[in-house]
Curated annotation (Swiss-Prot):
It is found in: Mitochondrion outer membrane. GO terms for cellular component: mitochondrial outer membrane. It comes from Xenopus tropicalis (Western clawed frog). Belongs to the MTFR1 family. This is Mitochondrial fission regulator 1-like. The gene is mtfr1l. The keyword Mitochondrion applies.
Amino acid sequence: MASLGAGAEPESVLFGKDGTEACESPEGRRSGRRKRTKIVPVWENKPCGSSRSLVRRIGSHLPLKPCTRACFEALPPASNLYLTDTPMVPTLADVKWLAADEDETYARVRSDTRPLKHKWRPSPLLVMQRNSSVPNLKMKEEKMFCLKKPGLSLNRSSDIQEELSILRSQIARIVAGDSASSCLGSDSIPVNVDLEASLPDYGPSYQSTTSFVISDITEEDELDVSEYSSASLVDSTISLQRQVESNMSDDDEDSLCLSKSNSFADMMGILKDIHKMKLNRDWSNRNQCLHKEEDPVNLISEVLRQKFALCDPDSVKNE
């Protein structure tokens, strides 16, 4: 274009009705020859648009064909061989999606419905297998924690000992009330009356040979008490023993450090040691802290002496 002069007019490509090209120059115009032609731009005659790339040009000359799509061949029906209509070997067409493929986002479509990760819950079978295969380390940690703190069992045993002392005082008050009522009834009855008629409420106590032991009584008092027994005191001691057993069972259930048999044996040993220490401390401080009349042991021993004072010494010796 630069070689052309400034006054030169560009040539225009003309296409006739029959499709032939014709060049119209200024000389032809001057000559007066006018043809009935139609002016068509060059780019409109191209089949691929206004600008044709190199790739399109190469592709138009090369014999390229699209890749063949994967096709799944259906197996012949196996109804002749088996009762079911399902094929013997499953194909990929039967698989909707693979649960193990987490990063295969290229294969997902909008209609794909698969469970999300945060909504997935393990089945009960998986939970059972996991609990059976994997050891439960949490229980072992709790057991070790209980072993590191033996003071918890000592505190519980001290609480049990305090409850036992409260029960002993209540037993002493009950026995004292029963003895007072029996003394009022025995004053109006003559001494010559038969023993069974004078004390009908305590008849079964003479026939029974069961003996009871109270922890705060000394060895001398135990010898005196073992010779005689009372139905009310036996019942109270039985209830006391049941309550102690229930407390011991609760402590064994709460403690996870040892098995049932070992924990029960250890707890009984701890209770025995604490009981001995408490007895020594109680007997050392008994004269300073407690009055003789308010002491449960003294009350029970005094009531027993008054209760069996009407017995004949010969019958007591024979028993």
